[in-house]
Amino acid sequence: MPGGTPRLEGHPFSKTGPDPATPGAATMPDSPADVKTQPRSTPPNMPPPPPAVTQGATRHPSFTPSTMMNGSSHSPTAINGAPSTPNGFSNGPATSSSASLSTHQLPPACGARQLSKLKRFLTTLQQFGNDISPEIGERVRTLVLGLVNSTLTIEEFHAKLQEATNFPLRPFVIPFLKANLPLLQRELLHCARMAKQSPAQYLAQHEQLLLDANASSPIDSSELLLEVSESGKRRTPDRTKENGLDRDPLHPEHLSKRPCTMSPAQRYSPSNGLSHPPNGLPHPPGPPPQHYRLEDMAMAHHYRDAYRHADPRERPRPAVHGARQEEVIDHRLTDREWAEEWKHLNNLLNCIMDMVEKTRRSLTVLRRCQEADREELNHWIRRYSDAEDMKKGSPPSARPHNSSSSSEAPQLDVHRDFAPRPLSGYMPEEIWRKAEEAVNEVKRQAMSELQKAVSDAERKAHELITTERAKMERALAEAKRQASEDALTVINQQEDSSESCWNCGRKASETCSGCNTARYCGSFCQHKDWEKHHHVCGQTLQGLPAPSVPTAVGQPEAVPPMASSPSDAGSAGASRAGTPGTPAPLESASR
């Protein structure tokens, strides 16, 4: 693991490999193909190798002591094989060509390996959190994204990670992160620039590129976390794996992953040399392209174009071994980036021009609507003035003389109120006030018309009710008259009958002593029927002599004849005093 005591690691073919320029030299599958063999102790100011051996030497990085990060130094980029990695972990697809951003500081293979280690480290942390619980795994994922996005410092990440997992990390973690995290952040920044996004947006959309469990072989979590029984000491790593002797038949999974360490950007790298095809020397071909990641393909195209069309500002600059040129990459723009910037500026100016044109059209439409509103306001004010003149109702004699003046006055008011004014003195409040007055006048007229309609409807309803009431009263009067006629008919029928009582209709046993015509069943019915009978009693005896009529007790001597008319009957009834007594025949019968 990185972070231990600095030491030199041996590579099977890093010091004494055969010269690739020799035609008859045998080449091992895992040996570098086109890198000139040179000892590790080469000084920084040593002149570059001949062009026949290394193509594009101006971009070839130097092997200075600054390249020994975390105590591990590695060989240059391998073309057809997988260089040995510490702890025997194969880089896999995680050796992204985007790691070549750090080639001005580290050798390409070293930068790619450090990025691969960092990604495996972060992936292992997340898997360890998921093994504890899904909640802790989510918290660890959030902390990792915050660390890569630079929203958390390394110390804050370290403290919060220990708080979330309750496991202390090994001492080498913080130096490892401080040494390798800038590489990952520069890779993220460059990928985000290519995708025209911010680093946070790019990381949110391509999170699987950072935390992909299948991208590389995860590290054992016990190598990152301290155990209680170890008393703060980490276990000794396997020296055979660190020395690259991991090609054991017991580890076939590394052999299956080894062809994927060749990214497209490394195939098109100028350090490969033009004398070799992209697939390299006799080596089994790699897996299909779908095993590469998207960022590998994008970075391959980017660097291929960058090497084909080199920046003319960089051509006269010779390569200075050991010099740091990250500022040039970060702050200087290539012709392609300048073209993109000018394209963005052009689009922005076009958008601004479109907005200005739309604003002008909107102002024109508003001005036309304002003129139409003025005309409609003038129309309503003219109608209002005419209605006011009609309401005032000037005398007929004065109306012809005053009509012209009264019609001119509203026109003058209208022109005075709505005359075209300069834009500076134009008050929208007056327009709104006059518009509200016109609308209120229309409302008042509508309400007056509605009230008139309601009053007319009420009047018609009252008339209809009165007519119906008169009809009902006439019907009731007719019914009463019909009932009285029916009663008289019944009485007449009773008068014709001599055997039934005139009051109740039962069998009669007595006769009225006044007229000797009315028949009753008893004195009760005679008294009950007296109110109706006294009008006709005695009319049949007008031609008879008076002494023949028996007199009753308390009854007058002579009964005056009843008039046939209702007035005579009323006067005759008034002249009679009280109710007649029981006739003599009735008294004799009762005895």
From Swiss-Prot:
Region ranges (Mediates localization to the nucleus): 1-381
Compositional bias annotation for Basic and acidic residues: 230-256
Residues where Zn(2+) 1 binds: 501, 504, 521, 525
Subcellular location(s) of the protein: Nucleus, Nucleolus; Nucleus, Nucleoplasm; Golgi apparatus
The keyword Zinc-finger belongs to this UniProt entry's keyword annotation: yes
GO annotation (BP), single: DNA-templated transcription
TAFH domain sequence ranges: 112-207
Residues engaged in binding Zn(2+) 2: 512, 515, 533, 537
Transmembrane segments: none
Biased composition (Low complexity): 394-410, 560-585
UniProt feature coiled coil, ranges: 433-488
Biased composition (Pro residues): 41-52, 279-290
Polar residues bias: start-end ranges: 55-105, 263-274
PROSITE patterns attached to this UniProt entry: TAFH (PS51119), ZF_MYND_1 (PS01360), ZF_MYND_2 (PS50865)
Zinc finger (MYND-type): 501-537
Region Disordered, annotated ranges: 1-105, 226-291, 386-420, 548-591
InterPro entries named in the record: CBFA2T1/2/3, CBFA2T3, NHR2, TAFH/NHR1_dom_sf, TAFH_NHR1, Znf_MYND
Gene Ontology CC terms, in alphabetical order: Golgi apparatus; nucleolus; nucleoplasm; nucleus
Keywords: Coiled coil, Differentiation, Golgi apparatus, Metal-binding, Nucleus, Repressor, Transcription, Transcription regulation, Zinc, Zinc-finger
General function of this protein: Functions as a transcriptional repressor. Regulates the proliferation and the differentiation of erythroid progenitors. Plays a role in granulocyte differentiation. May also function as an A-kinase-anchoring protein.
Family from the record: Belongs to the CBFA2T family.
Name this polypeptide is given: Protein CBFA2T3
Taxonomic source organism: Gallus gallus
